């Protein structure tokens, strides 16, 4: 059956990869995806390492109600340090860079052309409450797709 991506990519100039069924926040994933799009693989890896170490915050341009302001963001105010989603994105970026190296490209010099997060469902959970009752306590499940290409080429049809 194969895996479907939301865009068509030229296999001669691009490499791609996907995270499947990860229990990470869709809102955090969208914020990270918006921020790393257009970066090179090396820049994105260092950025995500800084986010995990809480040296650089991710701007929350959507879903930012109640999000505190961060002084390290230029041109925006609301931001957070989404550690769990950043670790998943870092794993995906390393995987796609490895795929690019296997295809004969220089993985660290390639640019992120397309990145998208999709909600695929929820993992059911329960939280015990008073007097023997329980409330739903579900976890969002996300897919993230990433396509990188050589700089100066246009191998992705969006």
Swiss-Prot record:
It holds the Pfam family Ribosomal_L22. GO terms for cellular component: cytosolic large ribosomal subunit. One of its GO terms (biological process) is cytoplasmic translation. The keyword Ribonucleoprotein applies. It comes from the Archaea. SUPFAM superfamilies: Ribosomal protein L22. InterPro entries: Ribosomal_uL22 (IPR001063), Ribosomal_uL22_CS (IPR018260), Ribosomal_uL22_euk/arc (IPR005721), Ribosomal_uL22_sf (IPR036394). HAMAP family: Ribosomal_uL22_A. Belongs to the universal ribosomal protein uL22 family. This protein binds specifically to 23S rRNA. It makes multiple contacts with different domains of the 23S rRNA in the assembled 50S subunit and ribosome. The globular domain of the protein is located near the polypeptide exit tunnel on the outside of the subunit, while an extended beta-hairpin is found that lines the wall of the exit tunnel in the center of the 70S ribosome. PANTHER family: 60S RIBOSOMAL PROTEIN L17. This is Large ribosomal subunit protein uL22. It comes from Haloquadratum walsbyi (strain DSM 16790 / HBSQ001). The gene is rpl22.
């Amino acid at each position: 059956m194969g895996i479907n991506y939301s865009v068509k990519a030229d296999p001669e100039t691009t490499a791609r990869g996907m995270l499947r069924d990860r229990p990470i926040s869709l809102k955090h994933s969208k914020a990270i995806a918006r921020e790393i799009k257009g970066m090179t693989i090396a820049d994105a890896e260092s950025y995500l390492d800084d986010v995990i170490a809480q040296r650089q915050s991710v701007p929350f341009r959507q879903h930012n109600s109640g999000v505190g302001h961060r002084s390290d963001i230029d041109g925006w105010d609301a931001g957070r340090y989404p550690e769990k989603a950043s670790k998943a994105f870092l794993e995906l970026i390393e995987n796609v860079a490895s795929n690019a190296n296997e295809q004969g490209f220089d993985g660290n010099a390639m640019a992120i052309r397309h990145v998208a997060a999709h909600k695929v469902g929820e993992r059911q959970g329960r939280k015990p409450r008073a007097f023997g009752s329980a409330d739903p306590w579900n976890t969002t499940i996300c897919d993230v797709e990433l396509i990188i290409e050589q700089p100066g080429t246009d191998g992705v049809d969006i």
